[in-house]
Structure formats: C-alpha cells, structure tokens
Amino acid sequence: MRIEEEIKLDYSDVLFRPKRSTLKSRKEVDLIRKYQFRHSKLIWQGIPIIASNMDGVGEIEVAKKLASYKLLTALTKQHEIKDIKNIASIKKFNNSIALSSGTSRVSYERLNKIIAKYPHFQFICIDV
C-alpha cells in the first residue's frame, strides 16, 4: 500500500468554479469580452487570450492570424523596427498586438523609438 501525503485540491480551492448554464450548445458561447481599463479609460473588445512573447509564438504572422479571431499577441522583443513597420501599416491589428520590451535601458529606448514612430499601438508587454 502507498500513502499519498501531498495536498489534493478540489473545487473549493480554485478561483474559477463551474456554474449552471442555460446554453443548449457550445456553439452559443460568446467569448468576446469588453474591458475598460481603470487608469487609461481605454476600451478593448475581443477574446482575452494573449499569445506569449516567446520565440516562435509572438511572431508577426501569428499576430496577424490571431487578430482575425480577436485574440491578442505579445510580439517578441527581438523584432526590428522595419519588421514592425510592416504590421503597423495595417490598422486593424493595432489593438491586437502588444509591443514587448525588456527592463534594460537599451530595451526601453528601443520601445520609445517604436512608439514614437508608430504611436497607434495601444499595448506594451514588459518582459522581466
């Protein structure tokens, strides 16, 4: 016999709990949400899922595809300004993309250059 001593979690230990639904089918589910940010008063509407700013995930082609489904992408911080120029010209993507920056002075200056050139991007991801 093996005795398991580690903590076991159940529904009383989680923040999200299932609740009764009046929906007849999963097709009726609407994932789109509308948020108003407390300090900027910016309103964003979409599906609140963000693709990470990891290599291979936070790429421009991924951002374009996910934006068509109203999902967000945090671009990797390695993108050059010329790469961002290609997506900045497509206005429908601007509220679906977060520009990424590290915490170094160089990263901060790079982010400021991008924002100065393309001020219509609304979101920033700070990679620590």
Protein language model features and the residues they cover:
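Active-site entrance/lid segments in N-terminal catalytic domains of soluble metabolic enzymes
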Residues: 1-128
